[in-house]
């Protein structure tokens, strides 16, 4: 959240682009980590097994993060004031008292089942529906590619057509893909799953810009953190419900219902008044 809120302050006129580049890097990391960990489990050079993978990732991450944090800073206050077009500046406490917060957090929560109910079982699901193990692995790789593309492209599109229109389109696509995924077999499992990861990651990537559109830039990091709690709730509640109720095909029903509920939440979303009470 801190990196994305900082980027939005520097590029207030292109917030979607700024957060999309960051989100694209996050999405690509999924493909890298999948291949890296599988290679580490087979062993290469000094990297042997899962412990070796963690040591290697730590050695790569530490200098990169330290260097990045050394140069990361907010723009001058004068530039921030010129960039504040909507005049909204809600503290976290004020934001929590608006219905817009609960609609946004609810939409984020309802975006999760389409992917998170299936990501732990996608290899098993693919093989049950006619793919061999090698082909089923492509669902993970192409899912990561879809995630990176969604995180990069859709926030940029939202700069032009608006966050609400973008999210409505993504939830509608997620609803259609979730329905198709229920009956998909063979390579259509991979296609549908990659499309769902595109939509899910795109919805997550548009959220930081949507947050600052609604609630302002000054408290962007904390406000975004509160909105992201919806994702945490969804990522725990929906899998728990599916496991508790021993749902198999029911997972697809939860995903379809979640996409429909998310669409309804965004449809009901409108800008915050400048003097919320």
Residue ranges, per PLM feature:
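Intracellular juxtamembrane helix-capping segments at the cytosolic ends
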Residues: 1-11, 18, 202-215
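A late C-terminal transmembrane helix in Major Facilitator Superfamily
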Residues: 21, 30-31, 214-247
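Symmetry-related core transmembrane helices of the 12-TM Major Facilitator Superfamily/SLC fold
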Residues: 51-70, 251-269
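Flexible cytoplasmic inter-helical loops of multi-pass small-molecule transporters
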Residues: 73-90, 277
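Extracytoplasmic gate region of multi-pass secondary transporters
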Residues: 93-156, 238
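Helix-to-loop junctions at the C-terminal end of transmembrane segments
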Residues: 151-162, 246
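Structural signature of the two symmetry-related core transmembrane helices
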Residues: 165-179
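Helix-loop junctions at membrane interfaces in 12-TM secondary transporters
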Residues: 183-192
């Amino acid at each position: 959240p801190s990196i994305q809120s900082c980027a939005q302050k520097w590029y207030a006129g292109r917030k979607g682009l700024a957060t999309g580049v960051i989100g694209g890097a996050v999405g690509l990391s999924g493909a890298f980590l999948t291949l890296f960990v599988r290679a580490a489990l087979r062993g290469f050079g000094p990297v042997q097994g899962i412990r070796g993978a963690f040591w290697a990732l730590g050695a790569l991450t530490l200098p990169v993060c330290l260097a990045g944090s050394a140069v990361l800073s907010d723009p001058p206050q004068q530039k921030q004031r010129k960039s504040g077009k909507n005049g909204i500046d809600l503290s976290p406490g004020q934001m929590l008292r608006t219905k817009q917060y609960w609609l946004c957090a609810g939409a984020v929560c309802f975006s999760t089942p389409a992917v998170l109910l299936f990501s732990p079982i996608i290899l098993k699901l693919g093989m049950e529906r006619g793919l061999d193990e090698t082909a089923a692995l492509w669902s993970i790789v192409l899912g990561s590619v879809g995630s990176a593309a969604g995180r990069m492209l859709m926030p940029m599109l939202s700069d032009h057509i608006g966050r609400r229109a973008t999210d409505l389109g993504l939830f509608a696509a997620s609803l259609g893909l979730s329905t198709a995924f229920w009956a998909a077999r063979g390579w259509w499992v991979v296609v549908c799953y990659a499309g769902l990861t595109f939509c899910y990651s795109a919805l997550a990537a548009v959220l930081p810009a949507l947050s600052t559109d609604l609630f302002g830039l000054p408290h962007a990091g904390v406000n975004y953190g509160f909105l992201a709690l919806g994702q945490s709730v969804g990522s725990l509640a929906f899998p728990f419900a599916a496991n508790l109720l021993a749902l198999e095909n029911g997972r697809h029903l939860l995903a379809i219902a979640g996409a429909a509920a998310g669409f309804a939440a965004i449809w009901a979303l409108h800008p915050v008044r400048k003097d919320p009470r």
